[in-house]
Amino acid sequence: MNGKGSVVVPIKWKIAVAILFLLCVGLLIALIVVAVVFSQYRDKYPSDTESNTCAEGILNEGEPPKTKGIFNDLTSEELIAARDFMLKQSSLKLKRIENASVKDNYIYMIQLHPPEKAAVLDYLEEDKAKPARKALVVIFEGEGSPPFVQEYIVTWPNNSGEMTYEKRNGNPILFNVRPYDQVQRKALTKIVLEATTKAFRLLNESYDGFCYHNCTNKLLKFHPQGPFGKTRDERTTWLQFTRDLEGGSLNPVDFQLYIDFPGSDVSKWKINKVYYNGQTFNTVDDLLFQYNKLNAISKSFIPAPKTPLFSSYDPSGIPLSQKARRSPRMFEPDGKRFSVSGRHIKYMQWSFDFRMDSVSGPQLFDIRFKDKRIIYELSLQEAISFYSGFSPYFMAANFVYGGWAMGTKTFELVGGVDCPETSKFFDVVHFVDTDQPQVIKNAVCVFEMDSGIPLRRHFETNGTGYKFYEGLASRVLVLRTIITVRNYDNIFDFVFYQSGAIEVKSTPTGYVQSENDRPEVEDDLFGHEIHTKLLGNLHDQIFHYKVDLDVDGRSNSIEKIEISTQDTANDWLPPERRILKVLRSQVMRLETDSAEVKKIDFDKPTFFNVYSDNKNKFDSKRGYLIQPLSAVKQLLPENYFITKMAPWSVYPLVVTRYKETELRSSSLYNQNSPTQPVVDFESFFQSANDRITNVDLVAWVSIGCIEIPSSEDVPNVASAANTARFFLQPFNYFDEGPSTDSSNAVFIKQDEDKSNVAQSSVLSDEEVCVPKKYDINLKGSYE
């Protein structure tokens, strides 16, 4: 301290303060820089905690379509109204299905009865009256003598008035051809329970503690085989028993019952045969008598599967990497590029309506490109799976899935697995084998995706570098549903390309059916051993589609274009000759002409063109090619009674004249009427007088695959390499490729200074967004 009382600050403290000040200034500058950079980074790469999630887009855009209410399935309210209306008709003597017996009258199914095509087009194009809403009601009339199935059409008036009903033409239908339902199952269960109660010890000893009743968590369950006999006069089925475990179809036991259950008098239903361990017996008592005798028959023992269960989906095996990484995800930076109004979809230049038929599955209507109808109806008609095997069940198992109401088996879809997380999901409602409408959540999905390949591209080089590049990613719209009939899950896709093409795909996955391997069977005759003493049965999967094309109007013809070779003189260098590929076109004039397409001739590649006499600006007839890329041969003889259930499976392609009496190629009843199918597809084209030139045409397309199960199909069949498909491809329909209208094309060329100049109307450096989180979840209830 000096004489004036002031404090002398040492120089070292002054230096320390100065350094500290500079450090603070530097830290402040650094914080400012970090804040600016972080702000820029956050704007470009927002975190999950930010609100900058990807937009949903506009899903309901513009005025409601004129097709609203035309193709939509009946709502729950409409289904209930139709049910209550029919229950009030005292002359029908109806009971509710939960209180009904086989000998009663009850409603089996209610669904939309689509309006006639002519009435729809009169409304859409001529502004005539809107077609009335109608319901198809199927009633099992067990009280009749004889009992039968009767179909009714219930109509709602467009204006004031009461609902009406009338019998549908072509009815009644014989009782024995009706589909399987809960009422029959209850009656069969009593027969099975009586038989398995007697055989309790046999089942318990043979199957390691498993039995049909009083076995706690070691239960067996049964499955009927179709068809139910050969003719309409009989109704029989083999019941296969499997363990009630995950993947039950991979856990069969060698015990089967042959049930005779015709008519409505259940007192006459009985067991005609019993199969056990490769042997058959007339009755359960006969089997037990032999079983209890010392060494009288060969006894079976099939041990219960061990834990972890081989047929389960629970993850097993070694992880593919030590540190699991999340898989790539789809996202939509600007929201969805398609709009939805009810069941009406608009995407780019495409638009269509869709519904879910309870019997046959997905149906698309009024498919337009650039607001011009190309297809009136594109729909799944039927699916079959015919099996081979040693046991009586598999010798007789030939499934026609429409007979099991496969359209009702469109269960919930899981986002991120079954469909991309960005999908728009739709509920469906059915009234089949129930007393109340059943709403199935998220049964259909619609999404846009990048197909992973350019729709078009070209790289032009001058030898030393490039001159230009042009390309367009193939982004498509997909409508998907998955139908699960017991063990198989069939994925059905309708894919819309910006080129004007439509791809239709059917992809089987799920579990295979299997039987216990038998030592006396010739090696690999009916399939391979896919697990310990378990045979994966050989079978096919064939799908049938209806394609009601309206190419530039309803007046169409079809030509067959064959590619062959021709020995041609080279007039430019005589006397040389050349073998050249040539086109040879032949107009199919009669329905019987198109029915001749029963096989694919690889010696003469063939294309089928449905065309209009209207021409494009190059004087070519506007047309659409039908390309059944996955045609599969029906190996069973054409006149075999099993083939007669699905005669369409013989023909890769048939073209017929549109008729209101030929709306479906199969029916709810074809499964159980093999020798006399209720809908005989071959009758569609047996007349030699039905011309198919310049008329409204319908194409019927079959695709499929033959399945040889292998050990890799356990626990589940992979979808890879199993897809069956066909294309509908524009053929001189447009004056140029319609994808040239796309705003997503990329064009790159060099400027004068040799720098790259990229042209695209969609900028890639726009602000990004975070995909919304999607919780994997199932509703699990259908009420």
Residue ranges: model-predicted function:
Residues 15-132, 136-231, 235-362, 366-499, ...:
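Extended effector regions of multi-domain proteins
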Residues 1-15:
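Short, low-complexity, Lys/Arg-enriched N-terminal segments of secretory-pathway carbohydrate enzymes
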